[in-house]
């Protein structure tokens, strides 16, 4: 094993299986240098490439954590990420880029599945109760949403399960059951039931307040997102008279951030729930 691979394994025990953080063998400054060279080589013939803007704290920034649930051949219930280019689950207890509270909640759910004698989804057989757990956290508000993606709408011992989960993690803001009973690689299904709380969380980004639902996309790195949006607006050299289209607008984070600087901005999106959230977010921010 090379020194670089040994270093990556020391930092993250599943780095060689997961494939998610492919530059883990480098220090963060080395990663930025590597990316700068790659982008520079690709684009330098067209335009000057400015230095990459890095993060002060490049760990545990990811405010959305998604874990697949399954069993090993020996029958052990596990949760984690899919191995690169496969649907094999790599058992993960914690991750260097994921929100710490989210990882702790997922570990608790793994234990509760065992203690409540619930089943986990068998992808080959197409049956089982728990398929995925999705956790979202508002970076500014600290509100936390837990989405239990299940293969059936029936939830044995539901009330007791939720009660114990909230006792272990009283800071959870809302819990939603999403039912996905189809043979599909898609994580979320169509039907949802709010089990606790209001069914969504809120967060503040670029001075705007946003409602975030289970199916709605929200940038996973809010610290860098604010920098990214700010630079995009700065480089656009807006005069305040422009009409702008925000394609794939999601819940309207770019749309509403841009609205302060232009005459009119149109958000376009295919996901219905995202548009519902976007309209609500426009009202919340008096747009």
Regions found by a protein language model. Name each.
Residues 1-193, 234-241:
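SAM-dependent transferase fold signal centered on methyltransferase-like domains
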Residues 2-5, 157-287:
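Rossmann-like S-adenosyl-L-methionine
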């Amino acid at each position: 094993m090379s020194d670089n691979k040994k270093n990556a394994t020391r930092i993250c025990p599943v780095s060689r299986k997961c494939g998610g953080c492919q530059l883990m063998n480098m220090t963060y400054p080395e990663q930025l240098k590597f990316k700068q060279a790659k982008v520079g080589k690709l684009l330098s013939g067209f335009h000057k490439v400015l230095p990459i803007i890095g993060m002060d704290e490049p760990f545990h920034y990811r405010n959305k954590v998604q874990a697949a649930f399954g069993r090993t051949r020996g029958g052990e219930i596990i949760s984690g990420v899919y191995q690169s280019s496969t649907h094999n689950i790599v058992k993960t207890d914690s991750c260097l880029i994921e929100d710490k509270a989210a990882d702790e909640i997922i570990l608790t759910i793994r234990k509760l599945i065992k203690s409540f004698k619930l089943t986990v989804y068998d992808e080959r057989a197409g049956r089982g109760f728990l398929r995925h757990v999705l956790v979202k956290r508002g970076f500014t508000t600290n509100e936390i949403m837990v989405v239990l993606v299940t293969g059936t709408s029936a939830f044995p011992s539901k009330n007791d399960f939720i009660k114990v989960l909230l006792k272990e993690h009283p800071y959870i803001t809302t819990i939603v059951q999403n039912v996905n009973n189809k043979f599909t690689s898609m994580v979320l299904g169509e039907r949802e039931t709010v089990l606790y709380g209001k069914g969504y969380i809120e967060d503040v980004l670029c001075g705007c307040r946003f409602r975030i639902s289970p199916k709605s996309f929200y940038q996973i790195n809010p610290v860098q997102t604010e920098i990214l949006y700010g630079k995009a607006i700065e480089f656009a050299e807006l005069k305040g008279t422009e009409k702008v289209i925000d394609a794939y607008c999601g819940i309207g984070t770019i749309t509403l951030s841009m609205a302060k600087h232009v005459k009119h901005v149109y958000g376009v999106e295919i996901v219905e729930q995202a548009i519902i959230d976007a309209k609500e977010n426009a009202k919340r921010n008096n747009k």
